[in-house]
Amino acid sequence: MIQQETRLKVADNSGAREILTIKVLGGSGRKFANIGDVIVASVKQATPGGAVKKGDVVKAVIVRTKSGARRPDGSYIKFDDNAAVIIRDDKTPRGTRIFGPVARELREGGYMKIVSLAPEVL
């Protein structure tokens, strides 16, 4: 579960390394986000020469969480870190590569470009 002020690792090569959650999108009183949800975030650490700079406000989709997600068959998927991919308004990633595994739940959310770029889909 990701909430306001949560710091996430960035799993793409957009230039950001770490982001801080500002808001969870999808309803006025929404507190928590899980895999496949969109957040508004601020870039806290960035690599030099990247597409995004420190202090930029970006949208990101969550691809991995430590708390995990429950699947319809009753199983759970959990990861070692909390990670997100920075996206544009049309749900395409800002970067050209995705690092680490991503959850299958992104496929139902319409993030096919992220799923196709990911090295592993769990």
From Swiss-Prot:
Gene3D superfamilies registered for this protein in UniProt: Ribosomal protein L14 (2.40.150.20)
UniProt keywords, alphabetically: Ribonucleoprotein, Ribosomal protein, RNA-binding, rRNA-binding
Database matches in PROSITE patterns: RIBOSOMAL_L14
Record bears the keyword Ribonucleoprotein: yes
Pfam family, one: Ribosomal_L14
Record-linked SUPFAM superfamilies: Ribosomal protein L14
One MF term in the entry's GO annotations: structural constituent of ribosome
GO cellular component, as recorded: cytosolic large ribosomal subunit
Family indicated by similarity: Belongs to the universal ribosomal protein uL14 family.
Biological role: Binds to 23S rRNA. Forms part of two intersubunit bridges in the 70S ribosome.
PANTHER family xref list: 50S/60S RIBOSOMAL PROTEIN L14/L23, LARGE RIBOSOMAL SUBUNIT PROTEIN UL14M
Protein name per UniProt: Large ribosomal subunit protein uL14
Organism from which the protein derives: Streptococcus equi subsp. zooepidemicus (strain MGCS10565)
Lineage: Bacteria, Bacillati, Bacillota, Bacilli, Lactobacillales
